[in-house]
Amino acid sequence: MSQTTERVGADELSTLKLVALDGALDGRVTVTCADLADRLDASNQTASRRLQRLEAAALVERDMTGEGQRIAVTEAGERALQREYADYRRLFEGDADVTLSGVVTSGMGEGRHYISLSGYMRQFRERLGYEPFPGTLNVDLDDGSVRTRARMDALDPVKIDGWEDDERTYGPAFCWPAVLETADGDRYGTAHVIAPERTHHGDDQLEIIAPEKLRETLSLDDGDTLSIHVSE
């Protein structure tokens, strides 16, 4: 779980859920501590403290008005709720697999360099069971998948440890097993989503590794639609 959500507990997350149900995921909504306290079966002071903690954790934004507080759930707050949702799916459905979709795009070539480094390649062979093709398949996620991606935090990744050589240190990375499916229905099952701890990519960009060059194996070009079924 991310550092942000570790700063709040179950009480704050239940409060976050209530304001999200009021519409705070889509924009600012007016919330009064008295009304929130009634719904939480708590005192006004307790409701106020929970909102303050959510704001301090950057899970909500608040503006004070004469009618109460105008509250919006932030992107970090939405990710926290997505993680809660994934946990409940695991509890009641037995798994929390995540399906993402987007379009293939060209990267900047950094993946080829880093994946080929011996400190990473050795761990890929040991922990993933294969030697990846030197390069990543880059996917620009659609808007819905950007929001859904947070559910991956509930999946246990394969950890690739950081390491160092005589020149610099290299950060850790996390890998999740993935099955890829093209718009034509072709599937590829020996792949992993990889997320370096140090990255300039945003949540809308996904990197995938596999033992083969996926563009050739799946006949993919820039702009082609791809579904990614992520598991653990």
From Swiss-Prot:
<dbReference type="Pfam" id="PF12840">
    <property type="entry name" value="HTH_20"/>
</dbReference>
<keyword id="KW-0460">Magnesium</keyword>
<keyword id="KW-0285">Flavoprotein</keyword>
<dbReference type="InterPro" id="IPR023465">
    <property type="entry name" value="Riboflavin_kinase_dom_sf"/>
</dbReference>
<dbReference type="GO" id="GO:0000166">
    <property type="term" value="F:nucleotide binding"/>
</dbReference>
<feature type="binding site">
    <location>
        <position position="138"/>
    </location>
    <ligand>
        <name>Mg(2+)</name>
    </ligand>
</feature>
<protein>
    <recommendedName>
        <fullName>Riboflavin kinase</fullName>
        <ecNumber>2.7.1.161</ecNumber>
    </recommendedName>
</protein>
<dbReference type="InterPro" id="IPR023470">
    <property type="entry name" value="Riboflavin_kinase_archaeal"/>
</dbReference>
<dbReference type="GO" id="GO:0000287">
    <property type="term" value="F:magnesium ion binding"/>
</dbReference>
<dbReference type="GO" id="GO:0009231">
    <property type="term" value="P:riboflavin biosynthetic process"/>
</dbReference>
<comment type="function">
    <text>Catalyzes the CTP-dependent phosphorylation of riboflavin (vitamin B2) to form flavin mononucleotide (FMN).</text>
</comment>
<keyword id="KW-0418">Kinase</keyword>
<dbReference type="InterPro" id="IPR023602">
    <property type="entry name" value="Riboflavin_kinase_CTP-dep"/>
</dbReference>
<dbReference type="InterPro" id="IPR011991">
    <property type="entry name" value="ArsR-like_HTH"/>
</dbReference>
<dbReference type="InterPro" id="IPR036390">
    <property type="entry name" value="WH_DNA-bd_sf"/>
</dbReference>
<comment type="pathway">
    <text>Cofactor biosynthesis; FMN biosynthesis; FMN from riboflavin (CTP route): step 1/1.</text>
</comment>
<keyword id="KW-0479">Metal-binding</keyword>
<feature type="binding site">
    <location>
        <begin position="212"/>
        <end position="215"/>
    </location>
    <ligand>
        <name>CDP</name>
    </ligand>
</feature>
<keyword id="KW-0808">Transferase</keyword>
<feature type="binding site">
    <location>
        <begin position="107"/>
        <end position="112"/>
    </location>
    <ligand>
        <name>CDP</name>
    </ligand>
</feature>
<feature type="binding site">
    <location>
        <position position="207"/>
    </location>
    <ligand>
        <name>FMN</name>
    </ligand>
</feature>
<feature type="region of interest" description="H-T-H motif-like">
    <location>
        <begin position="1"/>
        <end position="97"/>
    </location>
</feature>
<dbReference type="InterPro" id="IPR036388">
    <property type="entry name" value="WH-like_DNA-bd_sf"/>
</dbReference>
<dbReference type="GO" id="GO:0008531">
    <property type="term" value="F:riboflavin kinase activity"/>
</dbReference>
<dbReference type="Pfam" id="PF01982">
    <property type="entry name" value="CTP-dep_RFKase"/>
</dbReference>
<keyword id="KW-0288">FMN</keyword>
<feature type="binding site">
    <location>
        <position position="199"/>
    </location>
    <ligand>
        <name>FMN</name>
    </ligand>
</feature>
<feature type="binding site">
    <location>
        <position position="136"/>
    </location>
    <ligand>
        <name>Mg(2+)</name>
    </ligand>
</feature>
<feature type="region of interest" description="Riboflavin kinase">
    <location>
        <begin position="98"/>
        <end position="232"/>
    </location>
</feature>
<keyword id="KW-0547">Nucleotide-binding</keyword>
<dbReference type="GO" id="GO:0009398">
    <property type="term" value="P:FMN biosynthetic process"/>
</dbReference>
<dbReference type="InterPro" id="IPR039063">
    <property type="entry name" value="RibK_CTP-dep"/>
</dbReference>
<comment type="similarity">
    <text>Belongs to the archaeal riboflavin kinase family.</text>
</comment>
